[in-house]
Amino acid sequence: MKFEEFQLERNQSLFENEVDYNLSESGVHPLKISEILSSDEQNQILDKELYYGYTNGTPELRQRVLDIYDQNLSLDNVLITSGSAEANYLSIMTQLDAGDEIIYMVPNYLQIFHLARSLGIIVKTLPLKHELGWQW
């Protein structure tokens, strides 16, 4: 299987470290540990053993998410990912098969668009119009 090149991400990767002001970046500048944790909290981390963590998120974090959204579900219904790209990938890989159809709003971040097409999923676009206030 050959995946389509994700041109936006490719261009950002090529040039993101070559500019003084990166206007294409959608994330935030990384913080330092000292900006997040107190000295005591930093020392606590230094005393922790390193081990292979929970791939689906710690039970405590999953419970906190569950507490926010719905009390009628169990921890098995909550999955923590390392970011939206992983969540998008898991959604496509577990919910769709070749020949299935999805409707995808554009303009948008095109990760799902290219991944789905590479897997034989039919992608129909729903263009949002500037002149209609980004509605369809």
Model-derived regions: residue spans:
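Short, flexible loop segments at the rims of nucleotide/cofactor-binding pockets, characterized by
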Residues: 1-2, 79-80, 128-134
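PLP-dependent aminotransferase-like
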Residues: 96-136
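Short amphipathic alpha-helical segments
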Residues: 35-36, 92-93, 115-117
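N-terminal small-domain helix-loop-helix segment of the aminotransferase-like
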Residues: 2-83, 90
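Short, hydrophobic alpha-helical packing/hinge segments within bilobed ligand-binding/sensory domains
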Residues: 87-88, 112
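Conserved glycine-rich SAM-binding loop
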Residues: 83-84, 108
